[in-house]
Structure formats: structure tokens, C-alpha cells
Amino acid sequence: MTIFDNYEVWFVIGSQHLYGAETLRQVTQHAEHVVNALNTEAKLPCKLVLKPLGTSPDEITAICRDANYDDRCAGLVVWLHTFSPAKMWINGLSILNKPLLQFHTQFNAALPWDSIDMDFMNLNQTAHGGREFGFIGARMRQQHSVVTGHWQDKEAHTRIGAWMRQAVSKQDTRQLKVCRFGDNMREVAVTDGDKVAAQIKFGFSVNTWAVGDLVQVVNAISDGDINALIDEYESSYTLTPATRIHGDKRQNVREAARIELGMKRFLEQGGFHAFTTTFEDLHGLKQLPGLAVQRLMQQGYGFAGEGDWKTAALLRIMKVMSTGLQGGTSFMEDYTYHFEKGNDLVLGSHMLEVCPSIAVEEKPILDVQHLGIGGKEDPARLIFNTQTGPAIVASLIDLGDRYRLLVNCIDTVKTPHSLPKLPVANALWKAQPDLPTASEAWILAGGAHHTVFSHALDLNDMRQFAEIHDIEIAVIDNDTRLPAFKDALRWNEVYYGFKR
């Protein structure tokens, strides 16, 4: 059972009565065949549900209205099987508030060269029916995605599936509640922002809860529940001698388990799926939540440190998008550099809170060590290295008049040396196109020091995210050149200024 089981995507066929009952019967038959095949063979993340043909303005408007009010409907996939005059779609599209994808396909893959006649031509008109639909979308400034390809093509399946993930994620985001335990780290700028504007734009709400409210729940956790969770730790991780039974840090592990159980109970009771903490506001907690946060992220919660609610929300959104995909997604911070000509590297980490979903396959190490920040007892944490391969780091920032999403494509590499004195999980990567270009572009665009790191998602996913939410995206990859990047930022300033 995943979040995608809670949603469905409606498959809508556009046509008209001009072609007669027999043509419409064949259109319906084709649509049923295509939907059944896609549900069976395409490995889509959620189910396609075929709706009645849209052959008149009233029918189309009714479908769009029903989609808006059906909580299970994540979006619409539209196929213009025949020509469907686009003025029929205006009223429906004008009220539609769910994501929209045009599947530009046709029932047959190859032309029947020897038998093709005008009946065939009239039945299979995607080539120009799709263009008519595209015009009205452009005329109405309607955000919608387009996938072109035969319905049996695996590349088309992959792209439809990726769009479905965006559609479901958008619906989940409209219900997302972000809990901030305490406020921002004092005097930090980028983690702050306009929470009202964020709720208007994305749909998620952000509210603060006193740490004392959390402490009450934490203190109510029973020893029996703690013992059961400790047993899970024992089977899942490699415990250092200090954290094992009779070890001098065993009580710190028990306290970490108490905090984890309390945090999870608090989040579940409040319906929260993302949260923040800050080391400057820990009154009543015996240690900074480290292990607890790591494990909650692995369970799908969004998180960011120092009150950074934008990154916490983005992490939850990206975890929903990547559900079931290979690779993990985590809170991350660009921490320190390795400057070496031709081999510049970034070491990413945080004080404690890196998600084990990005870890290498062997068991993480559970340890308790001193943390000089926060003034509390030594916290428990999981220590691991990260899987290698292509990845992205993404940052969502508030520019006052709009949101900007920054994405840097990176290549995660194996740590060339052991890190015996580094007591935190970490990731090592090469930034594309190179560290000087990537860091300078990131800084010029205002990117945060906190990011969401993902092996599971790629640049195309984040482009779709930006498009579906109508926000600016700034991309740093192997094609980036600083003069052109600076120009793009200037052009975006003008473009989004005109849109206000």
C-alpha cells in the first residue's frame, strides 16, 4: 500500500458527434483497450480510470467539474482520438483545478498502407486533433503537459508515470501540514519566508508548535514501547560498544528512542507529514533529535533543520514523487569542499540528520557522540556513506515576489578515504559542470545552504514540478555557462515581473 493507491487518474477521450455513432463506438472500444493495456502493462504508479467520451461542451464541463470535486482524482489524461473542436473545451478547462496531461497518441502504430481510406483517416485524427487541443491550451494560458508516442511504447509509459507522480504529489501537497518545533535559527535569512504566500502557491500550511507540547508527548512514552523500538535498532543497525547493553551511552540510545516515539505520535496526532527542529529551541528535550529525525525521514516525512520549513516541505513533496523508485531522497547541506585541480568535491552532511534511504547497502552504524551545538546531552545518530551515481540537489527559495527552484545535477562518488573521526552520515559528490561554475551560479541565484538530495529523481522530474506549480526554475548542469546563466536570471526577473 502506497500513497498512489489513494488516487486515480481519469482518462478522457475527446471527439464529436460529427462522425456518427459507429465511429464513436470504435473510439470507445479503442479507449477501453488502451486503458486496460496501460493499467496492466505500463507499470504506472496509479490506476487509470476511463471516463465517458467528451463530445460536447456540457459533457466536457461535467467531467472537469467532477474531477475537481473527487478527492481520489489526481488529474486528467486527455486523448484526442478524433478531431474535437476546442471551443467545446473552454468552459471545462477554465474551471479545471487538477493537473492535465495530453497524451498525443493513436490506436494504430503503423499506417495500413494497402487499406487506408477516409474512414480510417476520420477515425484516427490525433495528429491534428491534438494540435487543436494544444491551441486552446496555449490561448487560455493553461498549464498542461504533453506526451507523444504510441500507447505501447515504454518511453511513453515512463513519461506518463512520471507525470502521474507529479499529479499525485500536487494533491498531497494541498493537504500537507508542516510542523515547526520552535522558530528559525536566529538571524538566518534563507530559512525564513512568507508562509502565507507558500500556502497560496503550493497549498501546504506551516505552523509553529512549542517544544514543550512535544516534550509532554515524549515524556508519556512507556518503557515497553521504548524496549520494542530498541529491539528494532538492534536488528537494523550495527551498534558501537558504547551503545550496546551496559555501554556507557546506552541510556542516550533509550532517550533517542523515546524522542522518536514521541515525535512520531505528535506528528500522527496532528496530521503532519513534514517538520523542522532547531538546536536553539530544545527546552525539555535531553538531546537534539538525530536518530529520530533520520528514521522519520526514511518513513516518508519531510524534514529540515533550523526551522527551514521550505526545505522540509520540498523533501516531503519529493519523497511522495519518488515513492517506489530506486534510490533515496534526503535532507542535505553543502558542508565543506575538497579543492583539487580536476577533482573538486563537495562533502555534504548535516549535524545529524541525513536520511538512511540514501545509504550504501551495509547496515548503518548507530553511535552516540558529543555534539558541541545545542548544549544538550550527546545525541544518537546513524552513520553511513552514500550510494554512488547520478543525483540532484534542489533548493526552494522565497524571492519575495515569487519562488525559485534551483537544481544542480551532481555525480555522487565513493569516499576515497575513511573518515574515522567524522561522526555523521555524509555524501561526497562532484558538482556539474564543475565546482567553481556550480557554486558561483548557485550563489548568484540565491540558493540555500540546505537542499534536498535525491538519487531517485532527476532534472526532468524537477522541471515538471516547477511547471505544474508555475514557478521559476534555475538549472545548473553540464550545459551551464555562467554568462548565459546570469542572462537567464535577468530574463526571468523581467518575465516574472510582467506576470505579477
Curated annotation (Swiss-Prot):
The keyword Manganese applies. Mn(2+) binds at residues 306, 333, 350, 450. Its cofactor is Mn(2+). The keyword Manganese applies. One of its GO terms (biological process) is L-arabinose catabolic process to xylulose 5-phosphate. Pathway: Carbohydrate degradation; L-arabinose degradation via L-ribulose; D-xylulose 5-phosphate from L-arabinose (bacterial route): step 1/3. Pfam families: AraA_central, AraA_N, Arabinose_Iso_C. Belongs to the arabinose isomerase family. This is L-arabinose isomerase. It comes from Salmonella enteritidis PT4 (strain P125109).
